[in-house]
C-alpha cells in the first residue's frame, strides 16, 4: 500500500459494501431502528413539543422543539441518520426527556431525503435550521449563544458539515456552534461512491470530496466529541479516528471514545444512560459553556 493510499481504495466492492453497511455487525437491525420510533412515540406523549415548526423554504424543512423549564437554557440540535435516505425527526424524539430534565432544551430536525434531495441540499437545510433556531431563540426562551449539535451516522456527517460552515456568509457568529457530538459518522464519503448506498445519492468522486468534512477541517472554537460503538466495522472506526486526528492537528479540542458493547444503532441510547461516560461527556461539554 502506498503512503497516500487508504484501506478502502484496495477493497473489493463486496468488502467495501460490507464495511459501509452498519447492519453487517448486528443481527437485530430492524428491531433496533424500530426502537427509535417506539421510544420516541412514548416520549412524545409525556413531553410537550412545539411540533412541525417550519425553519426553511420547503414544507419538508421542519423541526420539533422541546423546551426545558429553565430561562436561557442551552439547546441541543439533533440530526438523525439513515444514510441520507431514511428516518425522520419524529423517530429521534427519544433523547428529549433526559436533556430537558437536565435543564437543556432539545430539537430534532427534518431534512429532505435522497433521492429527492442531494447531500449538498441537506447540508444547506441543516444550516438553515441552525440559522432559524439562532434567530428564534427569544421566542422560545433558550439561549442562542448556547447551541450544540449532535448527529448520528449520516447525521454525524451533516452535523460536521454544518459545524464547519462559513457562518459569516449567513451573517451569523463564526462560533455559533459551541460544541458538537458525532456518533458513528462517515467523514470521508468517497468510499460509498462505489457502493449500493450511492444509488439514490448520485455522487461522483469529486463531489464526494467536496462534501466530506474530513477535507473541510480548520481551526474551530467548538468542542468536539467523536464516538462509535465497539461492534462496528473497521472502516467506521477508522473514519472517526482519522477525523479526530485531523481535528486535533488544527489545534482544536476533542474527546475520542469507543463505547464498549454497543453498535452503530444502539449507541444513541447512551445519551440517556446516567452512568454512561458518553452522556457525562456531552453534559459536561454543554454545562462548561453554559
What are the roles of these predicted feature ranges?
Residues 15-71:
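N-terminal cap/lid segment of alpha/beta-hydrolase-fold proteins
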Residues 69, 82, 230-232:
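Residue-level signal for short, function-critical loop segments
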Residues 73-82:
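Short beta-strand element of the alpha/beta-hydrolase
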Residues 79, 183, 259-262:
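Alpha/beta-hydrolase
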Residues 87-96, 107-146, 272-273:
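Catalytic nucleophile-loop/oxyanion-hole region of alpha/beta-hydrolase
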Residues 128-196, 209:
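Primarily recognizes the serine-hydrolase "nucleophile elbow" in alpha/beta-hydrolase
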Residues 173-175, 179-193, 205-242:
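The feature captures the conserved acid-bearing segment of alpha/beta-hydrolase catalytic domains
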Residues 237, 241-244, 248-290:
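C-terminal catalytic histidine-bearing segment of alpha/beta-hydrolase fold enzymes
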Amino acid at each position: 500500500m502506498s503512503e497516500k493510499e487508504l484501506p478502502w481504495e484496495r477493497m473489493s466492492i463486496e468488502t467495501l459494501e460490507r464495511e459501509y453497511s452498519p447492519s453487517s455487525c448486528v443481527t437485530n437491525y430492524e428491531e433496533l431502528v424500530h426502537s427509535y420510533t417506539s421510544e420516541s412515540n412514548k416520549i412524545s406523549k409525556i413531553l410537550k413539543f412545539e411540533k412541525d415548526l417550519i425553519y426553511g423554504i420547503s414544507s419538508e424543512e421542519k423541526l420539533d422543539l422541546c423546551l426545558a423549564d429553565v430561562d436561557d437554557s442551552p439547546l441541543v440540535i439533533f440530526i438523525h441518520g439513515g444514510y441520507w435516505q431514511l428516518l425522520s425527526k419524529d423517530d429521534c424524539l427519544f433523547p428529549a426527556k433526559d436533556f430537558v430534565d437536565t435543564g437543556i432544551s432539545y430539537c430534532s430536525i427534518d431534512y429532505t431525503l435522497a433521492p429527492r434531495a442531494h447531500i449538498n441540499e441537506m447540508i444547506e437545510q441543516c444550516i438553515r435550521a441552525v440559522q432559524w433556531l439562532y434567530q428564534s431563540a427569544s421566542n422560545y426562551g433558550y439561549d442562542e449563544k448556547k447551541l450544540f449539535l449532535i448527529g448520528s451516522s449520516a447525521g454525524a456527517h451533516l452535523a460536521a458539515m454544518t459545524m464547519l460552515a462559513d457562518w459569516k456568509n449567513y451573517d451569523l457568529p463564526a462560533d455559533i456552534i459551541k460544541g458538537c457530538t458525532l456518533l458513528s459518522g462517515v467523514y470521508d464519503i468517497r468510499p460509498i461512491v462505489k457502493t449500493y448506498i450511492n444509488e439514490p445519492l448520485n455522487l461522483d468522486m469529486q463531489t464526494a470530496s467536496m462534501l466530506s468534512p474530513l477535507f473541510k477541517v480548520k481551526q474551530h472554537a467548538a468542542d468536539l466529541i467523536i464516538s462509535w460503538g465497539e461492534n462496528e466495522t473497521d472502516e467506521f472506526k477508522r473514519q472517526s479516528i482519522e477525523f479526530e486526528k485531523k481535528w486535533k492537528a488544527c489545534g482544536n479540542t476533542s474527546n475520542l471514545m469507543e463505547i464498549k458493547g454497543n453498535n452503530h444503532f444502539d449507541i444513541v441510547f447512551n445519551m440517556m444512560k446516567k452512568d454512561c461516560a458518553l452522556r457525562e461527556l456531552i453534559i459536561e461539554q454543554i454545562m462548561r459553556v453554559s
